[in-house]
UniProtKB/Swiss-Prot annotation:
SUPFAM superfamilies: NAD kinase/diacylglycerol kinase-like (SSF111331)
GO MF term list: ATP binding; metal ion binding; NAD binding; NAD+ kinase activity
Keyword Membrane: no
PANTHER family in UniProt: NAD KINASE (PTHR20275:SF0)
Recorded name of the encoding gene: nadK2
Protein name, UniProt field: NAD kinase 2
Enzyme nomenclature, EC number: 2.7.1.23
Highest taxon of the lineage: Bacteria
Main EC class the enzyme belongs to: transferase
Cofactor(s) recorded in Swiss-Prot or TrEMBL: a divalent metal cation
GO biological process, one term: NADP biosynthetic process
Length: 301
């Protein structure tokens, strides 16, 4: 790795999107003009028109962010979650620019690139920590897999024609059992992702909690559950039914052994997000989902 400048920003982009390529070019030019160094993965640099001053790294490891003060991610939700993997492993804050649809993890839109560069150069941003979950898979008392998630860990059925038979547990006590398509164990950040699509509540990110949301459960009591952030959630797949599959943030998957037990608890390592705006989460929610608020009068003054 070549010698870095005093201030360096790592850039991660979805180079399969033409909009991302153009956006990356604009961000790189703006940062270099302002005297900041830019670092990019060599595999992505092949698809980007980058000047020679850009530092290239070969391997996508947490160490490739050593010395970087910020990780800028250009893309949709999938790219932002990929960036979150780098951010968590390195401790470097992530600043997302949404080039997709909803982009709840993003702090800016494509039209905000000039402002993004200006805020980064002047360090006019704040950093907040987002809760994660750690996931442990047990089989006959042995740990067979571990993972983590920023949004959610989902236990889902594999066979389309048969339900996944599960028993839910919270803090060492059984809650209920039923057949379903799956169970989503989510963070407040993930409450607007898969858990939201499954009928779960929207939880403000300032709230510390864990969510357990059934997917298409065949039961009268199959409501979303909101627990303490210190609770331990467990999904036990019944041994006499087809096995399931574990998805973490929709990116990493592993087939579960028959009769597996999946435990989800508050993660030991958060993801740090860079924030440019002081807008409330309520305003972000309204904007992202284009919610109808016509007729709102507000509290009398």
């Amino acid at each position: 790795m070549t010698q870095t400048r005093a201030r360096t920003v790592f850039l991660l982009a979805h180079t399969g999107r033409p909009a991302a390529i153009r956006s990356a070019e604009l961000v790189v030019q703006g940062l270099l003009r302002s005297g900041l160094g830019v670092r990019v993965l060599e595999a992505e640099a092949a698809d980007l028109p980058l000047p020679d001053e850009v530092e290239l790294v070969k391997e996508a490891t947490p160490q490739c962010l050593d010395g970087c003060e910020l990780l800028i991610v250009l893309g949709g939700d999938g790219t932002l979650l990929r960036g979150a993997e780098f951010a968590r492993a390195s401790g470097v804050p992530m600043l997302g620019v949404n080039l997709g649809r909803v982009g709840f993890l993003a702090e800016a839109e494509r039209d905000d690139l000039d402002k993004v560069v200006d805020r980064v150069v002047t360090k006019a941003y704040e950093v907040e920590e987002r809760m994660t979950v750690d996931v442990v898979v047990h089989k006959n008392g042995d740990i067979v897999h571990t993972d983590w998630a920023l949004n959610e860990a989902a236990v889902q059925k594999v066979s389309a024609e048969r339900l996944l038979e599960v028993v839910l547990e919270i803090d060492g006590r059984p809650v209920t059992g039923f057949g379903c398509d799956g169970i989503v164990c989510a963070t407040p950040t993930g409450s607007t992702a898969y858990a939201f699509s499954a009928g779960g509540p929207v939880v403000w990110p300032e709230v510390e909690a864990l969510l357990m949301v059934p997917i298409s459960a065949h039961a009268l009591f199959a409501k979303p559950l909101v627990t303490s952030p210190n609770s331990v959630l467990a999904v036990e797949v019944q041994p006499d039914t087809p096995h399931g599959v574990l998805w973490c943030d929709g990116r990493r998957t592993v087939e579960l052994p028959q009769g597996a037990r999946v435990e989800v608890r508050r993660g030991a390592v958060p993801v740090r997000l860079a924030r440019l705006h002081h807008a409330s989460f309520t305003d972000r929610l309204v904007a992202k989902f284009a919610l109808p608020v016509a007729g709102w009068r507000g509290a009398p003054h």
